[in-house]
């Protein structure tokens, strides 16, 4: 999605605010009314846990964004999307099992990640001197395609996995519905709110654009250490893969999910190497975390759900990073060094913000009484942190020239 479409879209919305606000309120009421007419598809206790996680993430966002209004917007939009998904599930007559509730965790993290990338870009453009309406258009231009691709890969991956494992069918429905409503909110609800309600002005910081590059330069002072880390990481990854294969109940859904996501990225990006890097980066983080997690406790078998849920979440940040990487690669500054520099300076901070918020939210869910939710939340938390380290520090440090 390039060109002027985002500016035209924002102008159309700005000239039709009353009609759009009416349509938004009617749509929200229709979706949410399912909760009152048909009843909630999940238990009240699970809803309280998820809402508590959202509240904690929004509280932390006040500090990370230096903006009370931005944190409030995150909470309101994420909650509206979540209630909209529950309402639609109620209208469809879907009653979620305890395993399927994990899909709601995926939806919440997906929505939060999408909003963080969109709002971080808005604040960055405003700090560079843009009026908020122009900043919204520029943010949509930069993030609409990565967010769409992120939602599609997550939905497509769960759908393919569900084809081979029937217990994932409900999860695929929930994730698909959440991804659809999430994207509609990104391109309609959020711009509509930002066209009617102004955020605080935030002065940009040096670390927003150059913080990660400075850390990478420090890592490059020890080239032998970096080379040793490459071989050590590859060795650990190989050992971890062999170790996990002994306990996995079925690897077919996982393998097909990975292949489906890679094919989708390849079709959109037209670059099989970058697509493969995005998939392998996410997979490596999850495999290493799962090995460490299950090596310290007794385990007889591991369900594919424990691997698929974090993979659907961790892959999102990889898509955002490599979308910017590919944007530079297809332009004039197309060397690996310049591509990493552009990706780090443009999307490094939003990825780090997303990682911190998701870590806090997943930590709350890590105390959930249900074993499935607790286990998947903790594994996803650790995998998110490790994936961010690989994407933002390790990979650039290895490929950038000193």
Language model regions located:
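Membrane-embedded transmembrane helical bundles of large multi-pass transporters/channels
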Residues: 1-245, 250-402
